[in-house]
Amino acid sequence: MYCPRLDHFVRLNKNGSIGKCGHMTNAIGFETVKELEDSKWLKDIKATMAEDKWPKECVRCQQTEQVNGESIRTKSIDRHKVLHPFRDDYLVVGGVLDNICNSACQTCYSGLSTKIGSLESKNYPRVDNYVRFWEIPQNRILEVDVNGGEPTASKNYKKILNRLPPNTKIVR
């Protein structure tokens, strides 16, 4: 069994750490991409998957595939076929850039929406991963897929769009 996200996806977590797939349960955050890529935790997940077994962190994809026959994992295999020809060690960067959002969707919470945070208290969490984004190896980024907050309301998102590395092929 194979999941390209294990080799090619990094996410900006709302606490500022660097993580792997946002669909994982109980995923660990790391200080740097290198620390993540060199971690025993990630090596163990890859080893489990290489044995054609589901890592416990990947239960969401496992259940989705059992019900629907496809998942984030299978969709990432299709995306890998598009991106891999450009660069062997490419990265897709996802996750939370900030939590600037003027909406208060029922399924959201203050960690991803400043609107909800402001309704809950004056001392709500503020997320700002702008600097963290630039710490990711820019030459490896082929796709940017940030969320958390509302990108159209985020000054950070606009600043990143204006300075994307030229190797970036896809922005979602």
Residue ranges and their predicted role:
Residues E65-R172:
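Conserved alpha-helical substructure of the radical SAM core
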Residues M1-I77:
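Accessory C-terminal segments flanking Radical SAM cores
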